[in-house]
Amino acid sequence: MAASTMALSSPAFAGKAVKLSPAASEVLGSGRVTMRKTVAKPKGPSGSPWYGSDRVKYLGPFSGESPSYLTGEFPGDYGWDTAGLSADPETFARNRELEVIHSRWAMLGALGCVFPELLARNGVKFGEAVWFKAGSQIFSDGGLDYLGNPSLVHAQSILAIWATQVILMGAVEGYRVAGNGPLGEAEDLLYPGGSFDPLGLATDPEAFAELKVKELKNGRLAMFSMFGFFVQAIVTGKGPIENLADHLADPVNNNAWAFATNFVPGK
């Protein structure tokens, strides 16, 4: 039977197109007709600038045409994939999962790098407030006290800390991948909701869709921030807050360009 498209008039399908193709519509020997309906997936909240074909693109009005597989259905899709990393649907799904998980870890990590140093500069005592130096306290004579309190966790073995981290983080990731754990089962492994949404932020679908975009935007910034913190630690040997204070005090001599020239051959 030739492929055809018809609009159903019933309220349940009003305004939706139903496609009949040779593979989905066949006249059987008994004279019965078998049909399969195909309804397009929702593109996101109506009127949102972050979803759909008219969404915000990576270069705004100067953006070229987006690849056909980037339809604006998912949060954070700005229509840019020069390397074709999202062309395969399974790879795309896996990369989306990895990006969201790494974004969340990066946001926590960036906060952990900055906050102790801010507290230390405002009079709160730490054994070591700089993030990349804190772990080395475990090799000191007194070991490492979490939050400076020996009654919480008094660590003196790097192997014990490593094993504890593997067990705890492995358990959390195992529960996430399996979709079940002490807090119940989750249908969506990236956005489980339920006990993980005690404030009910995801109850409104349109607000939830906007929050997904905000999470990815902040997560991507956090991943770049963590990369910058690593580079700063290697080049200056200082934490991010101290580097910022040095730059504000003397921006001419304390900036990325000034430090980059230190690595020029022959200098």
Curated annotation (Swiss-Prot):
Annotated residues that bind chlorophyll b 2 are located at 104, 153, 183
Give the N2-acetylarginine positions (modified residues). Answer: 36
Residues at which chlorophyll a 3 binds:
137, 147, 215
Q: Which SUPFAM superfamilies match?
A: Chlorophyll a-b binding protein
Where chlorophyll a 1 binds, per the record, is at 80, 86, 99, 220
Q: Which residues carry this modification: Phosphothreonine?
A: 38
Q: Which GO terms describe its biological process?
A: photosynthesis, light harvesting
| Cofactor remark from the record | Binds at least 14 chlorophylls (8 Chl-a and 6 Chl-b) and carotenoids such as lutein and neoxanthin.
Which parts of the sequence bind chlorophyll b 4? 165, 176
Q: Which UniProt keywords apply?
A: Acetylation, Chlorophyll, Chloroplast, Chromophore, Magnesium, Membrane, Metal-binding, Phosphoprotein, Photosynthesis, Photosystem I, Photosystem II, Plastid, Thylakoid, Transit peptide, Transmembrane, Transmembrane helix
Sequence positions that bind chlorophyll a 6: 247, 256
Q: What is this protein called?
A: Chlorophyll a-b binding protein 1, chloroplastic
